[in-house]
Amino acid sequence: MIQEQLAHLLEFLPDYRPFPPVKEHTAWQGLPLRAKQRFLQAGEAALQTPIAPLPLSLWLDFTHTGRRTPWETAYFSRRARLCALVSAECVEHKGRFLDEIADTVWAICEESAWQLPAHNSYVRDTPQLPLPDTTRPIVDLFAAETGALLALTRYLLPDELDTAAPGITARMERELDARILTPYFTSHFWWMGNGEEPMCNWTSWCTQNVLLTVFLLPTTQQQRKAAVKQAAYSLDCFLKDYGADGCCNEGAQYYRHAGLTLWGCLEILSNVAPEAFRPLFRETKIKNIAEYICNVHVEGPYYLNFGDCSPLAGRCGAREYRFGQAVGSDALQALAAADFRADADPDHLQNPDGSTHINLWYRLTTAFAEQELMEYAAVPQHRSAVWYPSVGIYAARQGSWVLGAKFGSNGDSHNHNDTGSITVYKDGRPFLIDIGVESYTKKTFSPQRYEIWTMQSAWHNLPTFDGVQQLPGAEYACLLYTSPSPRD
């Protein structure tokens, strides 16, 4: 689907300009007052918060104990700090935050590795190496996030940064070339796609952030064309694992990192090459992927959940709204706008998985869409029943009740042994629950995964016969004698 569009590429690929640089300050002054106040409040709090240290002992804590939280808490706090400081400087533009921005940028550039300890391996699903090899950078989810963050920081404040710390933007460009661009163009990471090998949210998520890095930096036309070609291949590998119905087998929480980052990729590609990639938003499969989140939404903050997904999968906002606009979905725009207005934390500063509050592009996309979101008046509507045959997910509503049923198999990404399980809500509140997953550790994505009690069928809404529980694998599936029929 995506690679077919390469035939329509023009010779020149321009910069991606999602927002004006800060020196074009009129647009920033025109942001809603509420957004500017949030940014300044977060930036001022960051000024009072020192840069978190990342000593070797924190990395080795994962190596020795398998705990992810100690390293990741400090790692994410650095990037959240930079997001807050840059956002504040963008709306104020008086230089008050520049020294701390430069300090934080420098600290991130000085890190030995941008990948997480939990992702420190070169071959998919193999044990992590005890220490990073600084001569062979790994582009994982958060190396790619870091690349996009630094690239956007440099794009927004190039002159200001070099005034505060002469030469710092050149350092940023060198690090981005060494840690993101060169590895991407010269190595093969599993998430880039490999024929029929199954992909997951890593593919669209990493690709989105690499594309941001490529098109926000002063890269060559050769690099840009190579990135577009690789991205098209990777996204086709990603899309092959989706059925025509658009169901995300990783659940609502991972839609934010899968379907929404697919939108991110297409947003970037359709801006730098509209004649080639904008028509993709008219594809029925892309629209179905976009609207999945509407169909598993229960009410308020709750979503039908299975596998590793939490029932509190995060509020919708600007990205969902823009995806809805792109594919022509009134339902998605209405849900996104209503959810945004109900969200006490629209910048997701308290996001529990640490992955949205470090993304500056998401934060600024929200600010520049905020006025539209506040004014969009349509009321969200839910379908009475939805059946996703590609994954085996059924959702139905009757009166005050909402039912979610997981058919399908135990071979999903982020799988639990939960085929046949159900969840129920009454009056918008949990009635029969799926507890989701505990904090990730080294064991979570290892051969010992199903030793963890939350992964086992006995801890889901399922029977256990004579002490025998379900087993993992696509061959362990629910047999349907009559398929549910969706009713509109």
Model segments located where?
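Long, well-ordered core segments of solenoidal/helical folds
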Residues: 43-54, 101-119, 168-193, 226-246, ...
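Solvent-exposed loop and edge beta-strand segments that line ligand/cofactor-binding
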Residues: 65-78, 90, 127-144, 186-204, ...
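Well-ordered alpha-helical scaffold segments within catalytic/enzyme domains
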Residues: 81-95, 145-164, 206-221, 260-275, ...
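Active-site lining segments of carbohydrate-active enzymes
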Residues: 129-253
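Carbohydrate-active enzyme catalytic cores, enriched for enzymes
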Residues: 259-431
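Active-site rim segments in enzyme catalytic domains, especially the processed small/beta chain
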Residues: 417-480
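Conserved small/polar residues in nucleotide/adenosyl-binding loops
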Residues: 481-488
